[in-house]
């Protein structure tokens, strides 16, 4: 039986296969990746060889043509290993779908096979030093010059920024557009493009193995053939795809909560104080029961939400709810679980310490939780 009611036998087998792969290729190396502050490209290649990169891509472009249920399995199993594997989810479920949905035939043939094989690692560059949630006010510009665009600007906090070979860059192609969001376009910038440089690898509180960087564009010459979709339609494309991004973040937070509860249950059953397991104390029991209840509610909410998403329903309000509530819940659970671990929970050798520092950023990226509440309020007519 699968984890979700929509899982069939093939999804269960796929999960087992992926878990076995990760137990061999990721778990033994994860601590070293955290120290190196980078996941090697060789791991991406292995993912591609096994069919775990963008399996939803159509077979004619090298993919397996699988449905979103497989993406759920991959996302969950990556998070189960550690949150620093979030870059795989960004590649599979966030960036590559833009090429699939809005790219033309030539672009699909040029880029998708590499995205599936691991020869390409993708990133999406929205955030700037002066523009995060306020996406319409980005300052990176792209000016048409014959068969090219000349791009100038800076991006920051870019997931997969160091390893990336393809970066989907959000640019202003019409700075005078009113309202401002009507002047935004999407350009695919390839590694090695003149005028494109990668900045420093940012030193984050958590997600140490996940490469996050600044990107610079100085008179960067990007072929007009790299425009994704239509000029000045970029904001619309982003709004259409951000729902899946937020769903992916919510799923990862749910898995993190499940993982933290599981490790804490194991700990309180074996750790003794005053001659008996600390799990026998009423305070510990109440805390763990409360966590288990929230996690069960989160699972049911996600299950329904994933089904609605696959059915093509409008999930904007509900996915915003899931994103803010599940990430906030995971943050709270991380603190409770660390407390139940006592002093050992503050030691790096215990996984709860890593979870404690990795989870907070989930409430910030993919649209801050405050923005999620604003979206919900507007759709409630407030």
Model-derived segments and spans:
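Long, acidic (Asp/Glu-rich), low-complexity accessory segments flanking structured domains
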Residues: 215-237
